[in-house]
């Protein structure tokens, strides 16, 4: 079922982390969750042209901390920080608590799944051919270090009457492997023919240990016994006596029945039998 489950939710607490980090009791949980959804929708509309890939919401005691990951942080901050102050005021009204806004830059937007999906959606809204947009995004991702990428588009592609689904893949995209660092993003393109959905999977490598990538020349972490306990070793397969008996290097050889020491002497003293000529016994018998 690797194709059906959400790749990020499948890898939570293994490789991925939650986008909302806070705790609440049963009564206040629905309201806080609704606030998070409204904040994300507001930021998606407000920062549509700022290339926002991810939004992380944290709630310390009676405060809120929002971290925005963007490939264009200058667009979010604005001139002398004017835009970010307006954004902070709007978020405080929306959440009802003091809000701290942090901006983090995405170094490689070409291998960020959400940014790839948003970019393809913007191109489809500008009437660019969907195959050209998908293949160009795949080439850029593979050129900048992605080990695999898969892009799927669904809807009335090119304005046809019957909706269909097309997808392209390059490299490896292991959906079932938990240690695979798989990035996933979804976006929608609102065209004149209807809504076209875009899904993107980007495989960045396998994580072996703590932040170690496969093929980096480091071995996998070994599991050691607790302190104070002796190491359990595998018992020997053969007893020590049998191993010593066969240490002469003749183990496995088949040995015949033992002969006495006098057998060689007897064979030397016995006279050899003369061969019987054919026809002598026949004449005597006649």
Curated annotation (Swiss-Prot):
Source organism, top-level taxon: Bacteria
Disordered: annotated span: 213-286
GO MF terms, alphabetically ordered: mRNA binding; rRNA binding; structural constituent of ribosome
Family annotation (InterPro entries): KH_dom, KH_dom-like_a/b, KH_dom_type_2, KH_sf_prok-type, Ribosomal_S3_C_sf, Ribosomal_uS3_bac-typ, Ribosomal_uS3_C, Ribosomal_uS3_CS
UniProt xrefs under Pfam families: KH_2, Ribosomal_S3_C
GO biological process: translation
This protein's GO CC annotations: cytosolic small ribosomal subunit
Ranges where the KH type-2 domain occurs: 39-107
Entry keywords, A to Z: Ribonucleoprotein, Ribosomal protein, RNA-binding, rRNA-binding
Cysteine disulfide links: none
Coiled coil: none
Compositional bias per record (Basic and acidic residues), positions renumbered to this chain: 241-262
Functional description taken from the UniProt entry: Binds the lower part of the 30S subunit head. Binds mRNA in the 70S ribosome, positioning it for translation.
Family: Belongs to the universal ribosomal protein uS3 family.
HAMAP family xrefs: Ribosomal_uS3_B (MF_01309_B)
Quaternary organization: Part of the 30S ribosomal subunit. Forms a tight complex with proteins S10 and S14.
UniProt name for this protein: Small ribosomal subunit protein uS3
Organism this protein belongs to: Nitrosospira multiformis (strain ATCC 25196 / NCIMB 11849 / C 71)
Taxonomic classification: Bacteria, Pseudomonadati, Pseudomonadota, Betaproteobacteria, Nitrosomonadales
């Amino acid at each position: 079922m690797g194709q059906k489950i959400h790749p990020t939710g499948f890898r939570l607490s293994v490789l991925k982390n939650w986008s909302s980090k806070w705790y609440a009791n049963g009564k206040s949980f629905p309201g806080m969750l609704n606030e998070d959804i409204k904040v994300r929708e507001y930021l998606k509309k407000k920062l549509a042209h700022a290339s926002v890939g991810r939004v992380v919401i944290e709630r310390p005691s009676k405060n809120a901390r929002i971290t925005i990951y963007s490939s264009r942080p200058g667009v979010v901050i604005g001139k002398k920080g004017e835009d970010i102050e307006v954004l902070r005021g709007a978020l405080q009204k929306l959440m009802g608590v003091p809000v701290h806004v942090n901006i983090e830059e995405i170094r490689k937007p070409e291998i960020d799944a959400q940014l790839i999906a948003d970019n393809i959606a913007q191109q489809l809204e500008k009437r660019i051919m969907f195959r050209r947009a998908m293949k160009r995004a795949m080439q850029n991702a593979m050129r900048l270090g992605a080990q695999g990428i898969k892009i799927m588009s669904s809807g009335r592609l090119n304005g046809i009457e019957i909706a269909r689904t097309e997808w392209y893949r390059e490299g490896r995209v292991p959906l079932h492997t938990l240690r695979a660092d798989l990035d996933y993003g979804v976006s929608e393109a609102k065209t004149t023919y209807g809504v076209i959905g875009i899904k993107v999977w980007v495989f960045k490598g396998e994580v072996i240990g703590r932040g170690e990538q496969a093929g980096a020349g480091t071995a996998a972490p070994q599991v050691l016994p607790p302190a104070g306990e002796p190491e359990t070793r595998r018992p020997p397969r053969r007893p020590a006596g049998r191993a010593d008996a066969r240490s002469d290097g003749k183990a496995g050889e088949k040995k015949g029945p033992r002969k006495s020491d006098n057998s060689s002497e007897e064979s030397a003293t016995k006279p050899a039998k003369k061969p019987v000529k054919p026809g002598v016994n026949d004449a005597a018998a006649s």
